[in-house]
């Protein structure tokens, strides 16, 4: 689709689930997008710096969202020493 200036404009940009890498459909009303702020040495949030995670309704309905969020945050270096059942 084009706007009045002739630029291509997409009406819908699909997201992918951060945990399963599946595309989140437009009618998945149980999906969430979570922003986790990066913090400095004093534990204060750094303005404008965050990591975004999208979790599908499938992951949430299976009760795996908390473990998936912990795993993703550990892989990105945001969490340390979190106990996991899978280890």
Curated annotation (Swiss-Prot):
The modification N-acetylmethionine is found at residue 1. N-terminally acetylated by acetyltransferase NatB. The keyword Cytoplasm applies. This is Small ribosomal subunit protein eS21A. GO terms for cellular component: cytosol; cytosolic small ribosomal subunit. Belongs to the eukaryotic ribosomal protein eS21 family. It comes from the Eukaryota. One of its GO terms (molecular function) is structural constituent of ribosome. Present with 27400 molecules/cell in log phase SD medium. There are 2 genes for eS21 in yeast. PROSITE patterns: RIBOSOMAL_S21E. Component of the small ribosomal subunit (SSU). Mature yeast ribosomes consist of a small (40S) and a large (60S) subunit. The 40S small subunit contains 1 molecule of ribosomal RNA (18S rRNA) and 33 different proteins (encoded by 57 genes). The large 60S subunit contains 3 rRNA molecules (25S, 5.8S and 5S rRNA) and 46 different proteins (encoded by 81 genes).
């Amino acid at each position: 689709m084009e706007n009045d200036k002739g630029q291509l404009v997409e009406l819908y940009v699909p997201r992918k689930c951060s945990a399963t890498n599946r595309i989140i459909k437009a009618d998945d009303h149980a999906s969430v997008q979570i922003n986790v702020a990066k913090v400095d040495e004093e534990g204060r949030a750094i303005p404008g710096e965050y990591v975004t995670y999208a979790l599908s309704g499938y992951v949430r309905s299976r009760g795996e969202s908390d473990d998936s969020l912990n795993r993703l945050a550990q892989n990105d270096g945001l969490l340390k020493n979190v106990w996991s059942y899978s280890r």
